[in-house]
Each structure stands twice: as structure tokens, then as C-alpha cells.
């Protein structure tokens, strides 16, 4: 790819449920299918997109590893399509720089992929109990932990780490770009408006007003202090000039995992908190997951 553009506001708000979006006809390297799944837990329909690899339609009996790729705050299930990320993935497939696997992007609003503070929006329960089983039944996903990964960007990075650290028995690998990790919560007071602005980006999933105790209970860094993560492959990176200071949180997670002698891959790269940074490092995250799949799956490519 010569250019990855940042999504326009109107594109961020697009959400076509039940439609099928095809890759450009001139490039038969895969396609994206955007559909929806009814949820009893959330009492609504949830839209999602699946990037199907080049061989999916031709090889009718073949099954594939699956990567759940979670979007950031303010985005939606079509973020890879309207940002140019789908073209990036297709380039990797076309140039044989990435093996084939399913990439699934569910819509999550501002949920942070957790069960909300008020208990009314149980997104984590939905994801594990309804979404994963539904998607893996509809599409030809290889069964079992060894063929399943989860990753995300910003809020999605938080969600991926949160879910994988709480349920490591379900995933072979987890990855995150610029995950919404906060090293130390600021003093919450009306006078501390500058620090409070960092909390507003978290939305109301953690309570309104913000509940520090609930945050700590769900914080991936807190969970990682005691979680049994043996066998889970871990990758995360962050820009050294992250606009929200999430680089400090990423460094704290790196320090914690190192102190526990938990193998992981962490990178602090030059850059901020934007699509340009994510696009530059997305290939490395995808390749990380494919290498994990390749080491465990019968036929990963």
C-alpha cells in the first residue's frame, strides 16, 4: 500500500447491517462480508464484518484459523474497510507475506468489550457466549484454542487484553496496538480537569461518575498480576508519543509480565495515537498471529 487514509467522520458513522461488501473486482485476493447476529444477552442485533481469505470460496471444505480484531472508540465493525486496512491485508495476501486466516471485526460501540458497570450491557458475556460460537459456526473456522486469536486497536486493544487475560484457555494469542492502558489513575476531582480529560475518553462503561474500583477490577494490567497466562502468546506495541499517555500503561504491562517471567513481545515505536501509526504496525501484529497459528494448526496457510 502506498497510502492509508484516516477515516472521515461520516465513514465512522456508517453501519450497513446485512449488506455484503466485496473487494475490488480487479483484485481477487479475498473479500469482506458484513452481516449481523442477534443477541439475547444484549437484546439487539450486532453487526460485524469478516475478511475472507483468497481461497475461501474455492476450497469449500477447508477450515481456517480465526482472528477477532477489535475496533477502537468511535469506530465500528467496518473500520478495516473504510480506513484502507482491508486493502493493506489484501496486499499482504497477494504478495504472500501473510498466510490465510479469517479476520472478524465486531461492532462494540463504546463498551470497551466488558460487562458494563451498571450490568445492563454485558458485552463480554455476549462476545464469549454468543458471538464467538455463532461466527465460528457460520464460517469455516478451525475448532479449538490453538486456531483462535484476539487483537485490537486502542479501546479494542484494551478489550483484547482484558478478554484474553481473563480467558486464556480460549485463545492461542493476543495482540494490541496502543491499548487503552492507564499506568496510574489521576486524582479524580473537579479541579483536576486536565487529568479528568483522560478519563472522559473511556466513556461510561466504567460508571457515571467514573468508578476507579470497577476500572481496576477490569484493567488488563491488574488482571495480569495473577492470571495464569502460560501458553498464551502475547504481543503489544504503542507509540512513544501516544496522545493519551497509553505508552506509560503499555510499559507498565511490559514491566509486570517481565517480573512474572511471562514471555511476551513488546515494542515502543515512534508515533502517536492515530491510524497512521496503526497502519504502519498492523502487518507485524497480523504476522505475529499467523506465526502462532502456523506453529499449532494442521494447515494454517
Region spans (language model):
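Positively charged n-region of N-terminal signal peptides that target proteins for export
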Residues: 1-6
